[in-house]
A protein has these predicted regions:
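A general "terminal functional-core" signal
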Residues: 1-124
């Protein structure tokens, strides 16, 4: 599964099993709706391990991301992914990526939020 800015780098994308290219300026609501639909489709794959690249370049203040997500939207994205994995007993490995916000502290805060949300989701 890859959810990404359709017109963003790399311009020639290697296809994945499920690609969702979003238009420039996509907001929280549209992004999260697309993610919910995609997670339904991922259920059919039944992966043994989820490799989650929690990119923060969709953040509104990111200079290169071209999407328009808020901190809250990114946190909800993470929550949806982690809850999806937890409920299905799927182990998840988290990597961070992107992060070209101005100010850069926005990227740092978004990275930290991913791990805060993971801690909440997997706290036993």
């Amino acid at each position: 599964l890859s959810i990404h800015g359709e017109k963003n780098f790399p311009f020639r994308k290697v296809p994945s099993d499920l690609d969702i290219g979003l238009p420039d300026g996509t907001d929280d609501r549209r992004y999260l709706r697309e993610l919910a639909d995609a997670l339904d489709a991922v259920s059919a794959f039944r992966p043994d391990l989820v490799l989650y690249l929690s990119g923060v370049d969709p953040l509104r203040s990111d200079k290169l991301g071209r999407l328009d997500l808020t901190f809250e939207g990114l946190m909800e994205r993470d929550r949806m992914v982690f809850e999806f994995c937890r409920r299905r007993g799927m182990p998840v490995s988290i990597a961070i990526g992107g992060g070209y916000a101005d100010p850069i502290t926005d990227s740092v805060e978004a990275y930290a939020n991913t791990f805060r949300v993971a801690r909440e989701a997997f706290r036993g």
